[in-house]
């Protein structure tokens, strides 16, 4: 068996990626989220496949087909809620994974990090299009509002929006193409995740200290396979509790009303995992400025390696940077809260302050603090 594992062309790839892979001996549970994201993606693809067998991407029947899945298909309700809440678990793992990368300086692996940013955009696009498919009120109006943002692009904006819509409004053509893209994108995400791993295995994993661990490596199996299985069990437990006890906790009640172009919901808002970006978008009174801020709120991650001024890689031994990191986390939670609130005083000014702080922290305050820490250590 050992010889086959190391000799067979396919097994050799699996062996060098998941079995005999040299891994640092001191990586903490924060390094579990990569494998958890893989599990989330598999869950989403499988549940999505079974949902697609019963779903119809037509404006007349989309909403009733989702109802049919929940009422008439064997365990259809379970598959539907696993898929909907699986997306939430996916984003929780994503945010923690990115946060880990920021804290421990994993962004210094430039190729891996940039593929990761690309993956984040791809997953966000997939989730947005998936939210449109049930064709409820929030699906329809969310699609209308977000696609309409592209009209802010000078010269080609309005033509681009109509091209994406496939007409003069969000209608049957839009729903059909969103379903097609929502089906294909997870496979693109899976391919990108493979490239992400490929680049990671070129350098080996980072570790909490941010120091080279070449002198102290252990095989991935059995140490980290067992550790990852624990993470998977906890993820599955959390997802199962969410699905079986409060499946609609993270959803919007408006989406249980069929889409009606003549009736606008009082508060149009996306799913909870987009609220921070939505708050940044709304905090700028200008349409084009808001769109740019929205894109930059994620794209800024690609510039993080260029803004690294510290002579230490990780924040493990940098208390000032640690404080700023947790302020950033609190700021993102504030933005998430603001994104779900109506556009009125005092939420407007809180959102604007939180948005300014978000960009200031990442672009100015953290790099300057890193330089200060270098000086304090007389480096």
From Swiss-Prot:
An annotated GO BP: mitochondrial electron transport, ubiquinol to cytochrome c
Localization terms from the record: Mitochondrion inner membrane
Membrane-spanning parts: 33-53, 77-98, 113-133, 178-198, 226-246, 288-308, 320-340, 347-367
Cofactor(s) listed in the protein's UniProt record: heme b
Binding of a ubiquinone, residues: 201
Membrane topology: Multi-pass membrane protein
MF annotations from Gene Ontology: metal ion binding; ubiquinol-cytochrome-c reductase activity
Binding site for heme b b566: 97, 196
The keyword Electron transport is assigned to this record: yes
SUPFAM superfamilies: a domain/subunit of cytochrome bc1 complex (Ubiquinol-cytochrome c reductase), Transmembrane di-heme cytochromes
GO cellular component, one term: mitochondrial inner membrane
Keyword Hydrolase in annotation: no
Role summary: Component of the ubiquinol-cytochrome c reductase complex (complex III or cytochrome b-c1 complex) that is part of the mitochondrial respiratory chain. The b-c1 complex mediates electron transfer from ubiquinol to cytochrome c. Contributes to the generation of a proton gradient across the mitochondrial membrane that is then used for ATP synthesis.
Oligomeric form and interacting partners: The cytochrome bc1 complex contains 11 subunits: 3 respiratory subunits (MT-CYB, CYC1 and UQCRFS1), 2 core proteins (UQCRC1 and UQCRC2) and 6 low-molecular weight proteins (UQCRH/QCR6, UQCRB/QCR7, UQCRQ/QCR8, UQCR10/QCR9, UQCR11/QCR10 and a cleavage product of UQCRFS1). This cytochrome bc1 complex then forms a dimer.
Family: Belongs to the cytochrome b family.
Other noteworthy facts: Heme 1 (or BL or b562) is low-potential and absorbs at about 562 nm, and heme 2 (or BH or b566) is high-potential and absorbs at about 566 nm.
Designated name of the protein: Cytochrome b
Organism: Cryptotis goldmani (Goldman's small-eared shrew)
Gene that this sequence comes from: MT-CYB
